[in-house]
């Protein structure tokens, strides 16, 4: 006596398509919600930013400014130099001081950009800073030197406008946390160089 085996029920193709569609719509909805949250948070970011660090150097400003005015000397103290020793460097304009220019092109660690000194005194060295990649932007930066009892207070600051994309980036990356430690390292290197030139 033969027994009939019940065949397994087949899922209708339309039901499968319905499940896939539901999953896709859910993922799209989550993505849209995520983007909405990011844009909402980005809109609360300030219109400008400023990163600043200071140290006291046991030396007068006259022994600090030569390391700032001559862009070729930045290789001796800049914290970014060691990140890509093979980066391309190009110097133009004045030999030092106002009008001196320095362009770099490196790997993903430092990107590409250029610097031009716009003010150079024993109290302040200011320069424009243009990044070409990984994200194009223009900022201003300066070193100020203030006499103190124990030497010179050296302050390094960078400031600029927060573009829309800049605000979005700052949802995930804090400018102060990202640049502050490198400013501290650069100031420490300058401090040691000024001591050696004593």
Predicted regions and their residues:
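Beta-strand/loop substructures that line and gate deep hydrophobic ligand-binding cavities in soluble
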Residues: 3-4, 11-22, 48, 118, ...
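Well-ordered beta-strand positions in beta-sheet-rich domains
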Residues: 52-54, 112-114, 138-142
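Hydrophobic pocket/interface hotspot
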Residues: 63-74, 102, 117, 127, ...
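Short, conserved beta-turn/loop elements at beta-strand boundaries and strand-helix junctions
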Residues: 122-125
């Amino acid at each position: 006596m033969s027994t009939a085996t019940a065949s397994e029920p087949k899922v209708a193709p339309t039901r499968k398509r319905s499940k896939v569609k539901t999953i896709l719509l859910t993922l799209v909805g989550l993505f849209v919600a995520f983007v909405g949250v990011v844009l909402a948070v980005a809109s609360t970011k300030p219109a400008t930013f400023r990163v600043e660090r200071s140290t006291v150097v046991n030396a007068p400003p006259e022994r600090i400014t030569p390391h700032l005015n001559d862009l070729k000397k930045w290789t001796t103290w800049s914290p970014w130099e060691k990140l890509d020793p093979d980066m391309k460097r190009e110097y133009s304009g004045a030999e030092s001081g106002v009008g001196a220019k320095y362009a770099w092109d490196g790997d993903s660690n430092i990107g590409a950009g250029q610097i031009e000194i716009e003010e150079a005194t024993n109290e302040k060295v200011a320069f424009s800073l243009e990044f070409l990649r990984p994200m194009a932007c223009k900022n201003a930066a300066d070193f100020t030197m203030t006499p103190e009892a124990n030497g010179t207070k050296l302050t390094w600051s960078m400031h600029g406008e927060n573009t829309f994309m800049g605000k979005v980036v700052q949802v995930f990356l804090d400018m102060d946390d990202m640049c502050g430690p490198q400013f501290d390292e650069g100031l420490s290197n300058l401090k040691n160089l000024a001591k050696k030139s004593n």
